[in-house]
Curated annotation (Swiss-Prot):
One of its GO terms (molecular function) is ATP binding. The gene is kdpC. The keyword Transferase does not apply. This is Potassium-transporting ATPase KdpC subunit. It is a single-pass membrane protein.
Length: 208
């Protein structure tokens, strides 16, 4: 009993400190010092949340910039994806993230890349095959990457300008204004947030 009592007290104290006090303190500090980041780095337009700058979205409209390839289609689905097959399975498996995980010699990887190249060239007829930036043809580890390289954004501008009626110079300024530089000038890569640039495009088009 003498050894059981201290062990029980320690367990209760640790439970309160680690399970209640510590999380509450961290939550309080984060809400005061980093409120925006602590709440998911949400992007709001006219008081309405349109997404997070940390999670990519699927854009199919020719007037908007496209993100990277996603093995989970940026976790979006259609009504058809919810229709079960003869075995009762649906195309949409619930909230998910991840990559294709194809090996370099896997024929499915080659086929997927070729299809993506052909689609991109069809949507961007002024672009040459060899000029397509690599990140537009490769999937991120999560399949939810919100960013593309400045080169990937720039190469889409002519087609977007034609579809939207927005001048190429104005689109380039939108890209420049939403480009984040390398951390400390050396860590990571310059990147463009796809949702942010598309929000600006939508504003010019009067959609939001």
């Amino acid at each position: 009993m003498k050894t059981l009592k201290p062990a029980l007290l320690v367990s209760i104290v640790l439970l309160v400190v680690c399970g209640l006090v510590y999380p509450l303190v961290l939550t309080g500090v984060s809400q005061v010092a980093f409120k925006d980041k602590a709440n998911g780095s949400m992007i709001e337009v006219n008081g309405v949340k349109v997404g997070s700058e940390l999670i990519g979205q699927s854009f199919t409209d020719a007037r908007f910039f496209k993100g990277r390839v996603s093995s989970v289609n940026y976790n979006t689905y259609t009504k058809e994806d919810l229709v079960p097959d003869k075995d009762g399975n649906t195309s949409y498996g619930g909230v998910s993230s991840g990559s294709f995980n194809y090996g370099a010699t896997n024929p499915e990887l080659h086929d997927r890349v070729q299809k993506d190249i052909e689609k991109f060239l069809k949507d961007n007829p002024t672009v040459k095959r060899e000029d397509i930036p690599t990140d537009l043809l490769t999937a991120s580890g999560s399949g939810l990457d919100p960013n593309i390289s400045p080169a990937s954004a720039k190469i889409q501008i002519p087609a977007i300008a034609k579809a939207s009626g927005i001048s190429e110079s104005k689109l380039q300024k939108i890209v420049d204004d939403n480009t984040s530089k390398k951390l400390f000038g050396v860590l990571g890569e310059d990147r463009v947030n796809v949702l942010k640039v598309n929000v600006e495009v939508a504003k010019i088009l009067g959609l939001i």
